Amino acid sequence: MNYTMLKGKIHRAVVKQADLNYVGSITVDTKLLEAAGILEYEMVQIVDVENGNRFETYTIAGEPGSGMICLNGAAARQVAVGDHVILMCYAQMTPEEAKEHHPKVVFVDDENKIARVTNYEKHGKLTEDFI
């Protein structure tokens, strides 16, 4: 039996654009994808912090260092520009792999620049000094 484990996460990124007429997906700054260990075209789950919407799409690599987070196609209806979103990617692992696994968690500032990268996910309240 395999487990589905959190592989990578970009926490509280700010939606910069929403393009309803694009074919689909989410465009993400390449630096953020790399820091979180998420590949271009990989499936991600997205949670909108402001409205609670939760949906899946795939990633498209955006310009490195741009801070771009753009929801495309139908996904653009799930968010508003300025909303905070959490992007999560999962991987299948054997029980042995799962026991040793630590996800890559990327915290960003309001410009979607990397503020901190950790290899753990723990319960707790976000504070300014945590990010």
UniProtKB/Swiss-Prot annotation:
- Cellular location of this protein? Cytoplasm
Broad class of enzyme this protein falls into: lyase
Tell me the cofactors it needs: pyruvate
Keywords of the record: Autocatalytic cleavage, Cytoplasm, Decarboxylase, Lyase, Pantothenate biosynthesis, Pyruvate, Schiff base, Zymogen
Domain of life per record = Bacteria
Which E.C. number(s) belong to this protein? 4.1.1.11
Q: Which reaction does it catalyse?
A: L-aspartate + H(+) = beta-alanine + CO2
Statement: the UniProt record of this protein carries the keyword Transit peptide:
no
Q: Name one GO cellular component term.
A: cytosol
Question: How the protein assembles, per its UniProt entry?
Answer: Heterooctamer of four alpha and four beta subunits.
A Gene Ontology annotation in the biological process aspect, one of them, is:
pantothenate biosynthetic process
Q: Which GO terms describe its molecular function?
A: aspartate 1-decarboxylase activity
Q: What protein am I looking at?
A: Aspartate 1-decarboxylase
> What does the UniProt PTM comment say about this protein?
Is synthesized initially as an inactive proenzyme, which is activated by self-cleavage at a specific serine bond to produce a beta-subunit with a hydroxyl group at its C-terminus and an alpha-subunit with a pyruvoyl group at its N-terminus.
User: What biological function has been recorded for the protein in this entry?
Assistant: Catalyzes the pyruvoyl-dependent decarboxylation of aspartate to produce beta-alanine.
Presence of the UniProt keyword Lyase in the record: yes
Q: What is its main location?
A: cytoplasm
Spell out the PANTHER family in the cross-references: ASPARTATE 1-DECARBOXYLASE
Q: Which organism is it from?
A: Agathobacter rectalis (strain ATCC 33656 / DSM 3377 / JCM 17463 / KCTC 5835 / VPI 0990)
| Pathway involvement of the protein, from the record | Cofactor biosynthesis; (R)-pantothenate biosynthesis; beta-alanine from L-aspartate: step 1/1
What family does the entry list?
A: Belongs to the PanD family.
**What Pfam family is a match, any one?**
Asp_decarbox
Q: For binding substrate, which residues are annotated in this chain's numbering?
A: T57, G73, A74, A75
Active-site residues annotated for this sequence: S25, Y58
InterPro entries (alphabetical): Asp_de-COase-like_dom_sf, Asp_decarbox
Recite the UniProt cofactor note for this protein. Binds 1 pyruvoyl group covalently per subunit.
On this chain, the residues bearing Pyruvic acid (Ser) are: S25
